[in-house]
């Protein structure tokens, strides 16, 4: 999960004297939403492709006020980067070191491929969303309820949280689902959503939807 294992460096960082027209060609060639800009070896920020299209004759240095300032450190983890993809509506994130020097990038496709290997996304089985008052929330208890009913607990995400309650979506095996439901309700949980079919098309759809929910959270 360490970022350095997923860094690519074939996408160049551009200087402030590069024209927006040239930068746009780079973005299009790689099918990325942003290009990255440096000045004297120091990372400055990222510019959206749409901004380049609207300012083709300008140099990137003139577009500094329109830059998004996002990046991730070389020593970070994949999960540190997930939120950035959603927040900045990007499919590429620059990786820098502590001196703000460009080290390469991570692309959303690479992250999605890696996350899809996690049991939460890769295992067949049931998806179950439960709600519990925030003061009573315990991931340990949630896993114990599943396993005490001879179910397998493949993973869980906190998909919603506020001052009143926490909602947790979990991937569990298909065994003893009725007794798992009943136990959750007996312990004060509200069953928000159940998805127990394992038809391939619906399963892939559910994985995508919950990955998007995770990013939004």
Residue ranges and their predicted role:
Residues 1-26, 36-39, 43-48, 53-86, ...:
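Bateman/CBS regulatory modules and CBS-like beta-alpha motifs in cytosolic regions of diverse proteins
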Residues 13, 18-29, 34, 203-211, ...:
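Intrinsically disordered, low-complexity terminal regulatory regions
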Residues 17, 31, 57-61, 110-112, ...:
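Generic preference for hydrophobic/aromatic residues in regular secondary structure cores
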Residues 31, 89, 166:
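Exposed loop/turn and edge beta-strand positions of beta-sandwich/beta-sheet ligand-binding modules
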Residues 33, 91, 152:
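Short acidic/polar active-site loop segments enriched in Thr and Asp
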Residues 70-71, 96-98, 102-217:
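Cytosolic regulatory modules rich in charged/polar residues
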